[in-house]
Amino acid sequence: MWPDVEETKDLLARARQGEPAAVERLLSSHRDPLRRMIALRLDPALAARVDASDIVQDVLLEVHRRLSDFLRNPEAMSFPLWLRHIAKDHIIDAHRRHRQAQRRSLDREQPLAPAALADHSSFELAGQLLDQELTPASAAVRRELQRRLEAAIAELDEDDREVILMRYGEQLSNQDVAAALGLTEAAASMRHLRAVRRLRAALLPGEP
């Protein structure tokens, strides 16, 4: 979960006044949610070679270097959203380097394959989509549900996929999603509902 919005605003204000301790606390408080956000978006082949923590460190170094630019106009974009933009650039670069190392080019028209949702997250989402209690269940049932969900998620457009990853992968509340994406809570809720409906349609074709 991303840090409290008001706490982040307070740290940003103190950082703007030149408090080094506030900058350190600001970056430290965002490290864990940033790592989870990055790990969910690494292709499995890349995740086997690159630790998400290494990318997090690179992102935070860039954030520290560019923080003064952000602080000139902090109302233009929420801090978590700014972090996510920087992180996405680093994720794309990491995929490009990985594929170049294997002598394959990165086609930007193709979405990056997200890492798998955690098993409990996949199961929770499957239960919501299929309108049934799915626990207890065998490992085989869980694996099949996860496989179907991942295939369906990969077919979503980028906006819908982001909301699903944030709500079920990062375990963010609707308020957190809204803050991270720069949306109102009502707009974030509607986007989540749309994404869930599209996933349900993919998993249950022919259902109303």
Regions found by a protein language model. Give the residues of each.
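Structural recognition of an alpha-helix C-terminal capping motif at a helix-to-coil junction
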Residues: D54-L61, M77-D89
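DNA-recognition helix of helix-turn-helix
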Residues: L149, D160, G169, N174-P205
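Short, Lys/Arg-enriched C-terminal cap helix and immediately downstream tail that follows
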Residues: R35-I38, L42, L156, R161, ...
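Sigma70-family region 2
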Residues: R16-Q17, L40-A47, D58-M77, R97-R99
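A short, charge-rich alpha-helical start-of-domain segment used by transcription regulators
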Residues: E6, Q17-L42
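Amphipathic alpha-helical segment used for protein-protein interaction
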Residues: L34, A113, D119-E162, L172
